[in-house]
Each structure stands twice: as C-alpha cells, then as structure tokens.
C-alpha cells in the first residue's frame, strides 16, 4: 500500500511539472513581438522582469548600429517600445539588456546572421516589402555546390536557378552576386532574401529569368561557417584582402559554364554586389 501511495505521489508530481512547463511555454508565447500595427508602426516587446534597462536597436532608425531607443517597463515585467510608422521594407533589429547587446527577440522566430551577429527581422508589407516575402508565384531553386579552384581547394557556392530551369533546355544569362566584407555564400540568401526577390521580379516580368551565382569571397575559408571540414569557426570581418579571389574568378566562371546551361558570352554575364 505504501508503495502504491509513493507511486501515485510521483505520478502526480510529474503531471504537475509537465502542466507547469506547458503553462510556462504558453506564457512565453503570450508576448507578441514584433507587432505590426495598422498604421505601419511596430511594437517591440521583451519579457525581462529583472532587467534594469532595455533598449532596441535596428535599421528602422536613422543611425543604424549606433542608434537605440529606450523601452518602457510595464507592470507585467514586459518591456515595450513602439516606433513611428515605417516604410514598406525588411528591417533587422536586436535588444540590449543591461549592457548585453545583440540579444535576439525570443518571441520572433525569424533570425538572420550578418557576419557574426544574429539579428531578428520583420517585413512591413507593401510595394517594396512584398518583394522580400515569398509570394504565390513560381519558385526557383537554390543549390549549394563545390567547385575546385586553381589552388586545388574546393570552394562552396550558392546558385539560384529560376523556375522551370530543371524542366527546360534553354540557356540563361548569369549574374555573379558578391557579398560584402565578412560575408559568405549564404549572405545574399539569408540577409538579402535573394531567392524571394528573384522569384517575385521574374513573376512580374521585371527581371529576365537568370542564374544567380553567390560565391564565397573569404579566401581564408572555403565555405560559410559549419559547412566544411573547417568546422564551426566563428565568423569575423576578414582582413585577407590579398587579391587572390580575383584570380579565382575566371575559374569560377568556367566552372559555372561547364555545369549549368548558361549563355557563355560576356554580354550575357553581369557582376554586382
């Protein structure tokens, strides 16, 4: 009888813990952030009842990276700030809590990496913002490929092909899209939303169907962090601007022409970034 009582108490305790954990999960989800209001303003919220100061920083403010706005603490322990109405666009932001910067919004599942910084993001819908969002249009494909360079190393690239490429036989122009300092072959796809933008522009007839090649221009590493034998190295602003990537470029173009149905002429190639 004693064993049965102990077992019943144990089961009851487990049930309480599971129920409590479930309640805590739902309580966290009660914090809505970011909330896009009808007038285009955005309300940010962060549950941090023990914090002394919380600010929000992002590219919706004029001086990106340095400008921040103080958030107000509510009695519930939630900190809150509402912006002015924002133009239609994609915006990145993060919180600063008691001096700890680069805190992603735990209520926002949408996160991108810019070099070594993780940032939350949101999209204000409208003429410009809609290009960043996936729409009900024909979608292209993105492949990650490895190409052998003159130095014997294989380097990783991301390549976008437009809708219909796999089923067709036609040849396409090529855009070589270069990332900025500290970036890699994933930068334009994640932070830049390249695939969504291309799908939408092509669907509207504003862009010719094309192949887009996104190279990894960091000569010290062969891929974005975590995608090669080099392991989970921490991304950083590389100072290895020795000009060797420029020497690799003809090899990259040749590899793309050999492996994809391209219009292999200079007038059908473009480079940007």
Model-inferred region functions:
Residues 35, 43-88, 98-124:
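Aromatic-rich carbohydrate-binding modules that target alpha-glucans
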Residues 140, 152-153, 178-265:
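Cap/lid segment of the alpha/beta-hydrolase catalytic domain
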Residues 87-156, 162:
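Non-catalytic accessory segments flanking enzyme active sites
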Residues 11-20:
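Hydrophobic h-region of N-terminal signal peptides that target proteins for export
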């Amino acid at each position: 009888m004693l064993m049965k009582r102990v077992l019943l108490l144990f089961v009851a305790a487990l049930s309480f813990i599971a129920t409590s954990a479930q309640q805590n999960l739902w309580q966290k989800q009660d914090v809505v952030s970011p909330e896009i209001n009808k007038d285009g303003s955005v309300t940010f919220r962060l549950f941090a009842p023990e914090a002394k100061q919380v600010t929000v920083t992002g590219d919706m403010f004029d001086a990106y990276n340095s400008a921040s706005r103080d958030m107000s603490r509510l009695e519930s322990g939630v900190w809150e700030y509402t912006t002015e109405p924002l133009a239609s666009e994609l915006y990145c932001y993060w919180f600063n809590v008691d001096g700890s910067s680069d805190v992603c919004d735990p209520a926002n599942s949408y996160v991108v990496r810019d070099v070594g910084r993780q940032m939350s993001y949101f999209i204000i819908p409208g003429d410009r913002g809609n290009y960043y969002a996936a729409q009900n249009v024909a979608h292209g494909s993105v492949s990650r490929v490895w190409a052998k360079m003159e130095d014997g190393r294989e380097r990783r690239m991301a390549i976008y092909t437009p809708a219909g490429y796999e089923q067709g036989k036609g040849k396409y122009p090529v855009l070589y899209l270069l990332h900025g300092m500290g970036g890699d072959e994933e930068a334009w796809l994640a932070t830049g939303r390249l695939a969504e933008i291309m799908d939408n522009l092509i669907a509207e007839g504003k862009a010719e169907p094309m192949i887009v090649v996104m190279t990894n221009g960091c000569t010290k590493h062969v891929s974005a962090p975590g995608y090669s034998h080099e392991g989970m190295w921490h991304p950083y602003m590389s100072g290895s601007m020795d000009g060797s990537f420029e020497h690799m470029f003809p090899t990259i173009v040749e590899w793309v022409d050999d492996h994809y149905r391209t219009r292999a002429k200079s007038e059908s190639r473009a480079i940007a970034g």
